[in-house]
Every structure is written in C-alpha cells, then in structure tokens.
Swiss-Prot record:
GO MF: peptidase activity; serine-type endopeptidase activity
GO cellular component: extracellular region
Tissue spec: Expressed in mycelia and conidia.
Mod. after translation: N-glycosylated.
Protein name as catalogued: Dipeptidyl-peptidase 5
Keywords on record: Glycoprotein, Hydrolase, Protease, Secreted, Serine protease, Signal
Organism the protein comes from: Aspergillus fumigatus (strain ATCC MYA-4609 / CBS 101355 / FGSC A1100 / Af293) (Neosartorya fumigata)
Length: 721
C-alpha cells in the first residue's frame, strides 16, 4: 500500500457535463465512511460499473479526515466488509473461502500493510453484517447473519442438495415476498469468538458459530428484503445480543408487529422479547413494528424504535430505552415528537442520543437526552441533504456520510452544539461523471394544497437560464407514504431527467413522510382524493408562478403509488395537461390488489379486507369504465416479472386497455427485475425508454440534439402491427 499516493478530492475533476443515464449509472458508488479509533482516517468501499467491460469493479480506500485526500487500501474485490480493531488493525470479511465453496473467511491485517494479513476463521456459509466487541482478555466476540436451516445449521447454497422437483407447496401465507418465494430456510444471526493467541500467535476461531435466532420458533432476523445489520446489535462488552424479529405467533402477511429479542452472546439461554405480549415491560397498547436496537456504551441500556399500530408500516416510530434486567414499563423518549426517526446512536458518555429522521424533505440528525420526557423536542444540527450514517470521533464530533440531490456521496463533520463543522469530501468534486453538479441545481417552494401547505422540489437543467422556458416533468413519488427528499437516487434521479432539457417539479403531496404524521396518515382510504387535489394545485401553481416552466409541453412520471397516480391521472382532467405519461409498477385494477403479498398494507389503506370493504378498494379504481373512456395521453407502461408487491398482470392489464383504446403506448418488461430496476444494463434501457418516450412527445427530442431517443436502445421492439 505504501506505493499508493494520497489523491486530492479534485484530482479527477473535468469539464461540467449534463448528467446522462450512462454517467448516472457508471458514477462511482461509495459506502459510508467508517473512522478508525484515532479519528485520523476513515475506510470506505467504492464500486463502479463499466459499459465497456460490462463488469463491476470494487475496491477499498482510506480517507484522510484532515485533508480530505484518499488512497487505495486494497483492490481485492473479495473484501466485502471491514471492521476496525485498533488505529491500524483491521478485521475483514473475505467473500470467498479457499476450503469451503460458498463459505467466507475472516482475516486480520494492518491498514499500513494490508496484503500481509492472515486468516483467522473459515466460516461454513455466506455471512455478512459483521459486528465486533473486544473483551477484557483481548478476545473478539462477533455476530453476523446468514441463512439457516430450521435445525439451526447454516445454509450454504453452493453445498445444498438440489431438489429433483421444482414444486412449491404452501399451507400458509406468505407464499412469496418482494421478489422471492419463501422456503424453509430463513435469516438468522450467528455468534462466534476469535480467541487471542499467546505471544505472536494471532486470532483464531474458538469453537463453532452459534445460531441465536433458530431456537425461537418462526423467528427471523434480519427480516428480508430490506433488513440488515441495523436489525441487531452486540453489546460493547460482547455479552449480549439484541435482534429484531417479526412476531412469531402472528401471520406475517397480516401484521407488521415485531419484537426486540435479547440473548446471551454464547447462546446459553434462548432469546426472549423485551417488548412482546408477555414481557413485563411492554408499553401498553404498543403493538407495531420494532426496529434498530442499539446498546448504550456500558451495555446496561438498549435504545430502539417501535410503532403503535400492528398493521401500519408507516406509523410514527417512537424511541424507547430499555434498562437490561428491568421489569418496569419501558419508557418512551420524546414520545410526542411529530417525526418518525429511523436510526439512533448513543454519545460516548451514554447521556445523549443522536437520531436520524426525515424532516421537511431531508434526512437530518437530531440530539436529545437519553431520559428526555415525552414533550421534549429534539434539536436538529444538520440541514440540507440526507444523512445516512454517522460515527463519533474522539473529539465528540460526528463523522457523517450522506448525499443530496446534487451529489451521491458527501462526508462532513458535525456536532450537536455547533452544527456542520467541516466538509471533508463530496463526489461532485471528485468524479468526472458528477462534475458541475451543486446546490444551485435545486430549489423548493410551498403551495396551498387540499388542506395544508404542501412542499415541492424544483430541479433545473444544465446551464439553466430563467429567462427561457423548459418543458415540465411532473414527478410523483411512491409509498404512498414516502417522499421526494434531498438525497441521491440511481433509480429515479430528477437531475438526470432535468438534464434532458426540462425543469423537474417533485411535490410531496398528502401521504408524504417527514412533514408531520397527520399529512402521512391523511392518505388512508383517500388515494385518489386529497393527493390528486394536491397535484392539481401544484400544477396550477407552477403554471401561474414559474415563468420558466412550459406546462403546455409537460410530461408526468411515477412509480409504485406514483404509478397508480399516473394511471389515475390518465383518466382525469389533469391527464390532458400532459403530452406523455410514464407509469412504472403501478396498480391499475382495484380488485387485483388482493394479489399483493403484504396484505396488511392494502387492508389498512382501505379500511378492511377485500370482501368486507370492497367499495373502498373500488372507490379509487383507475380501471373503472368511465375512467378508461377518458384515456388519451401517450403512455409508457413499465412492469417487471419479479415484482410480487404489484404483480406484472397489473401492467399487462393497463397496456391491454391502452392498446384496445388506441392510445399510443408501449410496454417495457424485465423478466429478472422486481419492483425496482437495478441491473446496470437494464437500468440503461429503462432510462433510454423512459426518457426517450417523454422526449418524443414533449418536443425535446427535436430541440435537443443530445437528448436520449427511443432508438438508442438496441433491444428489438416487438410490433406485429
């Protein structure tokens, strides 16, 4: 490593260019920056896809926290995770195993001589989410998660016996979830110990891994598809493990209820929930989803979040602090705060908590006393962008990693009493693909909506000139309880759309998160009501107040609930205001909602089951005959085969109707994608077709010689007409 030089963050800078789909997809993607104990450097990973080689490469680097310069730590793409053991010592996961196909290895090395490390453990399957704690004797206790058989044995896909039949048989739901079919294997947290050797002898695995989850029937942690290392924690002394699992006694498809379990690291006892129905400290009436368990520095307390409602995935998260061994009711902390935080860390002295929460179109950091009363209002100390990870430095400041609408990676320091202290690195100052992007690319406004003021982002194109006019792109977010935030996305990136020659307006209508729970909750049984009214009022505001926006040649696009709303708009007066529409994975036929996997979602959104409240389901039906008769705007329909949340039949049904009605339309399908399109090659086609579609009908294709065209896609179009 000594041959590598520290590189200036501006070393790769080049001339500003519009953000093309190719640049968006191939721009380096960096992980959170994890500081070493001294606070001098931080380690992070980078991956980058190439359309020349059609491969992704990855490497690890060190970031100098004083100068902002970086240098490569290792180019070994098999290094999947890194944990600091000391200022120079590192424990890392090698994603391959020389002795066990499908297994992984743990290696110990020095940051100053990375290639000279040694193997400390050979693990029998694929594991990730490594967390460690050093004991007084110098041993390293660790936890990680992998797949498990019902008997607790780690599941290794490469060594598993392939069944002779492809049949699947189910006696209960779930049958499938997100993009996979459920089987008898499940996620589980495993514990192990690396024993410190004597003298010059290094660490080695002491005994076998222990499954901490499988002894609890029907438990699973982390919970797929989005669960990960934040679903469990290891106490600083290595004695205890806390993990989240959905309620084993309840039907998983009908309830969001989950508990936080506590178990000794050595698995000497079976895990027990601290907030289950029979737990002595369970707060009265609190039955919703639990999340993000985090031990205090001395290990005697455990912070976590929990929702109240047992069927509402977007209920407000409330912070709780449990005292280990206590049978008293677990107290809430700042329980009346009208925000829904989703990450938490203790300050080193154990007196204060730092939480991350959506707030007014950002993800901000807040501080609050660990014993704050319910009426306490946490104090924000970051502003723009979306903070995604944060670690304490020796001087009690925080090293924060985040993003913004104008950069996919932003590292800075902040402190509760001082706010943002120092910017260390930002991708738009490093990467040629993002060069020229900056805060001036965006603005925001509020307008009077259906019942309250509504927020909207404005994203400008390259070389924006307010004396000119640019066609409108109307972005509608999914969820429906979600938002457009000041954060980077490689799937729906408004800057990449704007740089075709548009102004993007991205409103946060009724149902949006981060603006108070009342706005979020108001979309229940109201999908085509207040949110649609908000969008109409937003369009009117833009038409009347933003002189640089050409609403006569505008287009609209949305995914998931945003796709539903595009389908709803197609049959509404607002649909006639647009030259083209793009609907990605949206619901179309009201009665088809019963085909989803997370039944709690639809049953909560529409106030009952499909058979008890069918009128509610049909109230906002884009496929109602009277609405279909209004369809007229050219429409691109995108739907993929592995989308089990909103099955592909929804998109096919919509396309059938559009074709039968003679509306210009196209169907884009990916057999290997789910609710999202993430494969780089597929993502490129997705962008070419979505942007090409709107460019064709808005007139941008003719006015901008560099605009994306439908003809850019090399995949042949099937057209029997």
């Amino acid at each position: 490593m000594g041959a590598f030089r520290w590189l200036s963050i501006a070393a790769a800078a080049s001339t500003a260019l519009a953000l093309t789909p190719e640049q968006l997809i191939t721009a380096p993607r960096r992980s959170e920056a994890i500081p070493d104990p001294s606070g001098k450097v931080a380690v992070f990973s980078t991956s980058q896809y190439s359309f020349e080689t059609h491969k992704r490469t990855s490497w690890w680097s060190l970031l100098d926290l004083k100068t902002g310069q970086t240098k490569v730590l290792t180019n070994d793409s098999s290094v999947s995770e890194i944990v600091w053991l000391s200022d120079d010592s590192i424990l890392y996961v090698n994603s391959t195993n020389a002795d066990i196909p499908g297994g992984v290895e743990l290696w110990v090395t020095q940051a100053s001589s990375f290639a000279k490390g040694y193997k400390a453990a050979s693990l029998p399957a694929s594991f990730s989410g490594l967390k460690t704690a050093k004991t007084k004797s110098g041993d390293i206790r660790f936890v990680a998660y992998g797949q498990s058989y019902p008997n607790g044995t780690a599941y290794n896909e490469e060594l598993a016996t392939a069944p002779l039949s492809s049949a699947r048989i189910y006696d209960s739901i779930y049958v499938r979830h997100w993009d996979y079919w459920l089987s008898t294997t499940f996620n589980a947290v495993f514990s192990g110990t690396l024993k410190k050797g004597h003298g010059k002898n290094g660490y080695s695995l002491d005994g076998e891994l222990k499954n901490l989850v499988s002894p609890v029937k029907n438990a699973e942690s982390p919970y797929p598809p989005f669960g990960g290392a934040s679903d469990y924690d290891l106490s600083p002394d290595g004695k205890w493990v806390a993990f989240k699992s959905k309620a084993p006694e309840l039907p998983k498809a009908n309830f969001t209820t989950s508990y936080i379990y506590l178990v000794p690291h050595d698995a000497s006892e079976t895990a027990r929930p601290i907030n289950g129905p029979d737990s002595p400290g369970t707060p009265k009436g609190i039955k919703g989803d639990s999340s993000s368990p985090v031990f205090s520095p001395n290990g005697d307390k455990l912070a976590y979040f929990q929702m109240r409602d047992e069927t509402y995935e977007s209920d407000r998260r409330v912070l709780y602090v449990y005292s280990l061994g206590s049978k008293k009711t677990i107290p809430s902390v700042a329980g009346d705060w009208d925000r829904s935080p989703d990450s938490v860390k203790w300050t080193p002295d154990g007196k204060t908590l730092i939480v991350g929460s959506e707030d007014l179109g950002r993800t901000r950091l807040f501080s609050l006393p660990a014993n704050a009363k319910d009426d306490y209002k946490p104090k924000n100390f970051t502003d723009g962008g979306s903070a995604s990870a944060y670690y304490f430095l020796p001087d009690s400041s925080l090293l924060v990693t985040g993003s913004a609408l104008w950069t996919n990676w932003n590292v800075y320091t902040a402190k509760p009493e001082k706010g943002v202290i120092k910017k260390i690195a930002s991708a738009n100052e490093i990467d040629p693909e993002l060069k020229g992007l900056g805060p001036s690319d965006i603005s925001e406004f509020y307008f009077q909506g259906n019942f309250t003021d509504i927020h909207a982002w404005v994203i400008y194109p390259e070389n924006f000139d307010k004396s000119k006019k640019y066609p409108l792109i109307f972005f509608i977010h999914g969820g429906p309880q979600g938002n457009w935030a000041d954060g980077w996305s490689t799937r729906w990136n408004p800057k990449a759309w704007a740089d075709q020659g548009y102004v993007v307006v991205a409103p946060n209508p009724t149902g949006s998160t981060g603006f108070g729970q009342a706005l979020t909750d108001a979309i229940q049984n109201n999908w085509g009501g207040a949110p649609y009214d908000d969008l109409v009022k937003c369009w009117e505001y833009v038409h009347e107040n933003l002189d640089y926006v050409d609403t006569d040649h505008g287009v609209a696009a949305g995914a998931s609930y945003g796709g539903f709303m595009i389908n709803w708009i197609q049959g509404s007066p607002l649909g006639r205001k647009f030259k083209a529409l793009v609907s990605h994975d949206g619901t179309f036929v009201a009665d088809a909602k019963v085909s989803t996997e997370e039944l709690w979602f639809m049953q909560r959104e529409f106030n009952g089951t499909f058979w008890d409240a069918r009128d509610n389901y049909r109230r906002w039906d884009p496929s109602a005959p009277e609405r279909i008769l209004q369809f007229a705007t050219p429409m691109l329909v995108i739907h993929s085969d592995k989308d089990y949340r909103l099955p592909v039949a929804e998109g096919l049904s919509l396309f059938n109707v559009l074709q039968e009605r003679g509306v210009p339309s196209r169907f884009l399908n990916f057999p290997d994608e789910n609710h999202w399109v993430v494969n780089p090659e597929n993502s490129l086609v997705w962008h070419q077709q979505a942007l090409g579609w709107i460019n064709k009908y808005s007139g941008v294709e003719k006015s901008n010689p560099n605009a994306v065209s439908l003809e850019d896609t090399v995949v042949p179009v099937v057209n029997y007409n």
